Amino acid sequence: MKKGIHPDYHMIDVKMTDGTVFQVRSTWGKEGEQMALEIDPLAHPAWTGGTAKLMDTGGRVSKFKNKYAGLGF
């Protein structure tokens, strides 16, 4: 492999929606940082068989609904 072109791999903590934490090697963040998941196999309707739950963390869905309210979306 060519030197200096590949990102550095390091250990990070991944926090699932139920609070469990596990370690993985990743290029995300810095060594020891924690990535908190908003959706994972424990909470996703595709794996749980439940109804879809809309997570509007950035307000994008609300903005879309307000913009196109007259169209009946």
From Swiss-Prot:
Q: Which PROSITE patterns match?
A: RIBOSOMAL_L31 (PS01143)
Q: What domain of life does the native source organism fall in?
A: Bacteria
* One GO CC annotation: ribosome
| InterPro entries per UniProt | Ribosomal_bL28/bL31-like_sf, Ribosomal_bL31, Ribosomal_bL31_A, Ribosomal_bL31_sf
User: Which GO terms of type biological process are on file?
Assistant: translation
Instruction: List GO molecular-function terms, semicolon-separated.
Output: rRNA binding; structural constituent of ribosome
Q: Which keywords accompany this UniProt record?
A: Ribonucleoprotein, Ribosomal protein, RNA-binding, rRNA-binding
Q: Which Pfam families match?
A: Ribosomal_L31
Query: Mind telling me which PANTHER family this protein's record contains?
Result: 50S RIBOSOMAL PROTEIN L31, CHLOROPLASTIC, LARGE RIBOSOMAL SUBUNIT PROTEIN BL31A
HAMAP family this protein is in? Ribosomal_bL31_1 (MF_00501)
Which protein family is it in?
A: Belongs to the bacterial ribosomal protein bL31 family. Type A subfamily.
UniProt function note: Binds the 23S rRNA.
Quaternary assembly: Part of the 50S ribosomal subunit.
**What name appears for this protein in its UniProt entry?**
Large ribosomal subunit protein bL31
Q: In which organism is this protein found?
A: Cereibacter sphaeroides (strain ATCC 17025 / ATH 2.4.3) (Rhodobacter sphaeroides)
Gene name, please? rpmE
